[in-house]
Amino acid sequence: VGFIFHSFNLMPYYTALENVAFPLSFRGVPYDKRMRLAKKALKDVGLESHMNHMPGQMSGGQQQRVGIARALVTDPDIIFADEPTGNLDSKTSDDVMRSMCETVKSHGKTFIMVTHDPNMAAYADKVINILDGRITDIYYNKHENGGGIE
């Protein structure tokens, strides 16, 4: 299982590469392989040129893409995201969501997202509305942005 946080949760004293490689250390992946996999994950989200940047040197959208790469690097079958664009402006949110959709499709992953933003829900193939803890509506999205996100 991969997880993309609302507030990025990047380690401020680690580079983008180190942030992405970090979860692999808990799995006992050797250092060289961790770095190779982290570089590939950053390339997959369009941040190959930012791998040595610290979080404070990157925009919010770039930091969120580091978070996406970190979620993908362990090759999970399912990725959960909690308001993944909540801290971003609308243009950056759209850019990040397009990147996420492309990445999810190219890796064949299931992506489940929680959002209060109907613009972000428009990227989903399936939407489940919940009010006061109860499902109020379920529908399949026909919007052009639909991209394999539930």
What residues fall within each predicted segment?
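Conserved beta-strand-loop-alpha-helix hinge in the C-terminal portion
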Residues: 126, 134-150
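ABC family nucleotide-binding domain
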Residues: 1-123, 129-130
